[in-house]
Amino acid sequence: MTATGLDRPFDLLLARFITTRPMRILSGLQPSGRLHIGNFFGMMEAALKLQHEGEAYYFIADYHSLTSIHDAKVLRENVRELAIDFLACGLDPEKCVFFRQSDVPEVTELAWILSTVTPMGLLERCHSYKDKVAHGISASHGLFAYPVLMAADILIYDSDVVPVGRDQKQHVEVTRDLAIKMNEAFGEGLLRIPAPRIREETATVPGLDGQKMSKSYNNTIQLFEEEKALKKKIMGIKTDSTAVEDPKPIEGSSILALYKLVASEADYDVMVADHQRGGIGYGDFKKRLLQATWDYFAPMRARRDALIADSAYVDRVLAEGAAKARTIARATLTRVRDAVGLG
């Protein structure tokens, strides 16, 4: 080592890590089709709060989507829809970095390097592979090695925190294992070891039939449903046969559960009281839910219309986000390449 201390990448690495910076938070979003309100209240709302907590990086996981989407037109449309929807719902490019995963190709090279230290048994123990195959997704190497690419997604941005649901905690644990293996093999401190932040489980958002809202059950209300379609769906929510004059059950009411998400606390309390008192039919409650849902998403709907009309803005946001992300990714990949002997 010379007096400059720059002959080994780890000296630069140590200096960089000692430098304080805001907590870096990473969140990946799969472009799997049109979003519904279950997605919004179950995932999007929490994800949007991250941009106020630190240095937030959001990416659209289009590489990952190739394991289940084999139609180029559909994938492009899904990516576009997701970008527009997240921006419409409040993602602020001035407060976060928002980009397409595939616009940062360095992540695939890091994934390959990580794969060389990944034990087969580690991947075989991942429940996500078995779960997805059980749900009809064709078994493939990409699906099997999914956790390695996810680890590369996390590690290439020196992420500190990765918010995940409890069902995805294992993916962050795999990432930590691989980072530790790389550090042990090629130099302590080579890769930052991230920590999972387990999202508090939100209440299950009920679908039109009372089951959990899911595309699999064909019971969803799309996030930006047209007014006529929204009315048809909400007025068609399944209810019991309680007579108009009788009190309505509170427990298990899909109408009340949905109304609580979109109405003010005061309005929700009024609807609960009206259920308990009786004398009001389900049709009236559904109309209140319809109006509250339409009003709740009105500002987002207006922003979405503006974004659709200004496609150049959306392109610019994604391009600028990718440029920022690649700056970090290139630095990480350079030090990893040097450490393993490729530099």
Regions inferred by a protein language model and the residue ranges of each:
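Short helix-capping/linker segments at secondary-structure and domain boundaries
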Residues: 120-124, 156-163, 263-271, 301
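Conserved nucleotide- and phosphate/pyrophosphate-binding catalytic cores
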Residues: 20, 170, 176-343
